[in-house]
Amino acid sequence: MEKISDLIECIAYEKNLPKEMISKVIQGCLLKMAQNELDPLARYLVVEENKQLQLIQLVEVLEDDDERLVNDPSKYISLSKAKEMDPSVKIKDELSYSLSLESMKQGAINRLFKDLQYQLEKALEDSHFEAFQKRLNSVLMGQVILVDHNQNTFIEIEQQFQGVLSMRHRIKGESFKIGDSIKAVLTQVKRTKKGLLLELSRTTPKMLEALLELEVPEIKDKEIEIIHCARIPGNRAKVSFFSHNSRIDPIGAAVGVKGVRINAISNELNKENIDCIEYSNVPEIYITLALAPAKILSVEIKKIPIEELSAEEKESIQERFIVNNHLQKAKVRLLDIEKSKAIGKGGVNVCLASMLTGYHIEFETIPSVKENAENENEKETPKVGVEALESLFKN
């Protein structure tokens, strides 16, 4: 047993496995070997004595005429034979025998060592799998080792694991070559015949959230919380923040002095424009903030039962806007000169605002009031944007 213990300690040191795991693996392999090589019906136990593992066979003491002595001799011993070894033994006592590997054939020993190696490798993989499962949605960094013909990028992570960044999880316009360093978020851990495969992404909103947590210490310290995040990767993103500390401005903390924090993140994401928004639990205010830089006059929230929607509406509405079988809809009133800002280039602004807030947004435009010197009745300039919304919710 000493040689086995020395071998396991050596492997454990090389593989950086905990001693408890090693002990469990050894015991399992010894028990398996005993059942396969000695007697599958016997009862075995592995115990630790003087920092060495001992393989023990257990037998129960029975009356001399008990039928189980004939039917199952590997598990039982007669009282008369037991007393020859220990005069004080009684019925139902258990006797134990220490078994030595030296009495076993070389083939059995080789199979034991092979099984130990396999089980240790499996235990190591299980340990790494669990460790990476805990790191899901966190940023990993590695070096490109291969870009295949489908533009899937294979990355060496921590000098022993392989990650893959598929083309569809790559920001549009990005290209990588062997030797490049890459940051990406871990989205899935897979077991393959060659070992663990780490699936990575640079397009998921979780990538932006993870980078913000790395760059903004107030988020890691839980003084600021990311509430929602919406992205069109490589183009534009909107992130809403809430401060749990009244002394900390969540937007100022996220942006940093002269934009140093948010610019660092933008550069990592291929110059993606990132809008930082303060979260509000009042949907009307939240939607108004999300549609910036457009100035909004008012927001009307509607929750429409699905059964009241037409077939065409059901097909066009995205599932993210359906909550408790109701369509979450926001009717936004704004001046006609503000509509293009609210929609944004290619519809990006309104798309991100909808993704961020969870509301299907529709616009109602109001003609702009032009200055007219001949107008007899001078009108007060209406409030717009958040100022207008907040005035509606004041007591």
UniProtKB/Swiss-Prot annotation:
Q: The KH domain covers which part of the protein?
A: 243-291, 331-378
Keyword Transcription (UniProt): yes
* UniProt-listed PANTHER family: TRANSCRIPTION TERMINATION FACTOR NUSA (PTHR22648), TRANSCRIPTION TERMINATION_ANTITERMINATION PROTEIN NUSA (PTHR22648:SF0)
Residues annotated as coiled-coil are none
Q: Which UniProt keywords apply?
A: Cytoplasm, Repeat, RNA-binding, Transcription, Transcription antitermination, Transcription regulation, Transcription termination
Query: For this UniProt entry, what is the primary localization, expressed as one broad class?
Result: cytoplasm
Sorted alphabetically, which Gene3D superfamilies does this protein's record hold? 3.30.300.20, Nucleic acid-binding proteins, NusA, N-terminal domain
Q: Which family does it belong to?
A: Belongs to the NusA family.
Q: What is this protein called?
A: Transcription termination/antitermination protein NusA
Q: Where is the S1 motif domain?
A: 137-201
Per the record, the domain of life is Bacteria
Q: Which GO BP terms sit in this record?
A: DNA-templated transcription termination; transcription antitermination
Which Gene Ontology cellular component terms are annotated?
Answer: cytosol
Q: What does this protein do?
A: Participates in both transcription termination and antitermination.
Species source reads: Helicobacter pylori (strain J99 / ATCC 700824)
Q: Which GO MF terms does the UniProt record name?
A: DNA-binding transcription factor activity; RNA binding
Q: Localized where?
A: Cytoplasm
> What Pfam families does this protein's entry cite?
KH_5 (PF13184), KH_NusA_C (PF23095), NusA_N (PF08529)
What is annotated about its quaternary structure and interactions?
A: Monomer. Binds directly to the core enzyme of the DNA-dependent RNA polymerase and to nascent RNA.
